[in-house]
Amino acid sequence: MLHTLSCSPYHADLDTLLRGLDKGDALVLLQDGVIAALAGGNIIHRLLDSAVPLYALRPDVVARGMTEQISNSAVLIGYNEFVQLTVEHPQQLAW
């Protein structure tokens, strides 16, 4: 399943999201959800502990001026890669 987080992690039920992640899933951070990928923050460590691939939509990171602050553990992707992930994961859950 492809999980997408589009709101600030401070306004999302992060605990429920993390409990819902399973092996084979992927998580894409987009819009304000990219805040969750800030390096050195509490949230990025919780997401990485889930052991699912973590992606952040590059245009949203750039639009927020956060390129230098994003953790190296989050893979920055463009729209084409995002579409490819939707093909690989036909089921999606938006948070």
From Swiss-Prot:
Major subcellular location class: cytoplasm
Gene Ontology terms: cellular component: sulfurtransferase complex
InterPro entries: DsrEFH-like (IPR027396), Sulphur_relay_TusB (IPR023526), Sulphur_relay_TusB/DsrH (IPR007215)
Source superkingdom: Bacteria
Keyword Repeat appears in the UniProt entry: no
Function (record text): Part of a sulfur-relay system required for 2-thiolation of 5-methylaminomethyl-2-thiouridine (mnm(5)s(2)U) at tRNA wobble positions.
Name of the protein in question: Protein TusB
Organism the protein comes from: Pectobacterium carotovorum subsp. carotovorum (strain PC1)
